[in-house]
Structures are given as C-alpha cells and as structure tokens.
Amino acid sequence: MTLRLLEDWCRGMDMNPRKALLIAGISQSCSVAEIEEALQAGLAPLGEYRLLGRMFRRDENRKVALVGLTAETSHALVPKEIPGKGGIWRVIFKPPDSDNTFLSRLNEFLAGEGMTVGELTRALAHENGSLDLEQGMIPEMWAPMLAQALEALQPALQCLKYKKLRVFSGREPPEPGEEEFGRWMFHTTQMIKAWQVPDVEKRRRLLESLRGPALDVIRVLKINNPLITVDECLQALEEVFGVTDNPRELQVKYLTTYQKDEEKLSAYVLRLEPLLQKLVQRGAIERDAVNQARLDQVIAGAVHKTIRRELNLPEDGPAPGFLQLLVLIKDYEAAEEEEALLQEVLEGHFT
C-alpha cells in the first residue's frame, strides 16, 4: 500500500518515483524541524534531498512524508528504516529496474561507437549466420569493439545475475539451510573477492545473506556508520561470531566497558552492543534476558548515574529493546543539545 502511495503521490506531482522516498510511521505530533533532523541523520549517504510534503494516514494514525532526491540511487544505499521521534520510521523506495539500467548502458556505449543494437546483433551472428567461436566466426573488424563492449558492460552484467551467498544467522545450532560461521566466512570471502562490482553492491549482497543475530549486528553498525564497508562488516562478524574469547573473559570485558568522558551515550550503546551479542552467541546471556542485560550495563557504565531517571525508565518496568532504547537516548541527547544551545543564546544576549 505504501509503495502504491509513493507512486500515486509522485504521479500527482509529475515526478519520477525512483527519485523519491516515502517515510512512514511518523508521529502525529512530530514537527517539520524534527522530521528534517531525523532525515539529516538517517539519509546522509544519499547526498542532496528535499522534504516535499507530509500527509496524515488515518488507518495508521501516523504521518507520512515525501522526500525528493536529485537522482536515482542504488538500492544498497537506501536504509529500510531510520530512527525518529516516537520510534522507528520506515523508508519506502522504488528501486531502479536493473534490466533498463543494462540496456541504457549498452545503448550509451554503442552510440559512442556509432553503432546500433541491430548492427551489434548482426556482428555477433556474422550476418545472420551461426556464431561459431571455435572457428573464429566473429568478423575481425568487430573483435576489438566487442571486447571493449563486454569490458564496459561487465559491472552491469554482474548486477543482473550473480550467485547468491549462503545464509548465516549466528544461531546455535544453525537452522536448516544455514551455514556455521567458519564455512560461511570462507565461502563469502572468496565470492566477494571474485565480484567486480562497487562496494555498495557487495554490501547489499552480504546483507541479503544474513539473518537473525548476525543481521542485527550489522544493522547496529550501520546506524552508527551508514557508509560502513564490506570489509568492516566482515571484521565485525568475525569479532562477534568467530571463536576467539572464552565466555568468562568476554563477560569481564563487557562489564568493564564504560562510557568515555566525551563520548555520547548513544555511541557508547553502539560500542557495547557487539560485545553483548557475542555473549549471547556464547550462551553467557540468555536471549530473553538480553534487553535487561543491555540496560543494566548502560546504566552502570554511563558517565551520568541518573540516566534511568533522565530516560523516564521505571525501576520495575520491562527493559526496552535495542532500537527503542536508542530512540529514547537520541531524543534525550537532542533535548540536551537544544537546552545547551538555548542557554548559549541567552548568555550571549545578556552579556
């Protein structure tokens, strides 16, 4: 329904739906400034964009916003969701048609060589005859041009068809259809080396193979660094799921990881999360206790010991999940920054 809304909204504004995003799940009380702030943080990898309009959806009791892009973008760069006021906002995107992309590149190359697709087809078929590579039936005059065309179109061909990676979730034991970490990592590393595509496409294919806890780890890292590379993703997975630390040493490291003096609380939580997921993977923390374990360590390791009160978290209430906690902290940090800015303005006014 939301993709159809994106297409209809763009059609009404006479714009290309592939140059737009629909942001859904926005709180009814969220202001334009708060929407802009969330977009600035969540859509940074996309470059220039513009908030075009907002709409209230009665069936969800939430707002949606239309965002315009300056150009079509890669599916790998568009986040599926971004943190915003009141919770997580969904990002709806109409990806480019890979077949059209390939044909566009082919036509662009041929136009530069003064050829048409029909002429290229006849050259490959050797004037409508059968193509016999063993007998060297490609005309000598076309050979260099065809080689150049294949080289130029290799990235597009790689994107159109590729062998998907095996599935890894980090669960123990692996579920049917999933690989254990060592075998998965070896296979994935070899495949990624062989792909001749941009890093963003490699990262998209990597994320496509992840499930469960493994996918959660990379999502956490992407929140902190939207431009994280494939190598950095693999390194993080190695640190969490590779056999390195014993559970006791890991638990000590987790419990002695504290917020640094100049470090934001949200950055501390993001730094802490891979260690927590590793403890869960080793069986040192039960999965149903992970939210409470996270909250306990954040409160214990935070510079300001009143953080539970600042976040309005009751002593006897259930611990929030990771994304919910991060949203609470982001709102708290935004309020603190706004208060500090106001104080600075007031001090400048009265001095």
Curated annotation (Swiss-Prot):
- Family note: Belongs to the PNMA family.
Gene Ontology biological process terms from the UniProt entry: autophagy; extrinsic apoptotic signaling pathway in absence of ligand; extrinsic apoptotic signaling pathway via death domain receptors; intrinsic apoptotic signaling pathway in response to DNA damage; positive regulation of apoptotic process; positive regulation of autophagosome assembly; positive regulation of release of cytochrome c from mitochondria; protein insertion into mitochondrial membrane
Location(s) in or outside the cell: Cytoplasm, Cytosol; Mitochondrion outer membrane; Extracellular vesicle membrane
InterPro entries per UniProt: PNMA, PNMA_C, PNMA_N
Assigned keywords, A-Z: Apoptosis, Autophagy, Cytoplasm, Membrane, Mitochondrion, Mitochondrion outer membrane, Ubl conjugation
According to the UniProt record, where is the region BH3-like?
120-127
Post-translational modification (record): Ubiquitinated and degraded during mitotic exit by APC/C-Cdh1, this modification is inhibited by TRIM39.
Sequence motif LIR, location on chain = 49-52
Q: Which GO molecular function, any one, fits this protein according to its record?
A: ubiquitin protein ligase binding
Q: What's the chief localization of this chain?
A: cytoplasm
Name of the protein: Modulator of apoptosis 1
The species this protein belongs to is: Macaca fascicularis (Crab-eating macaque)
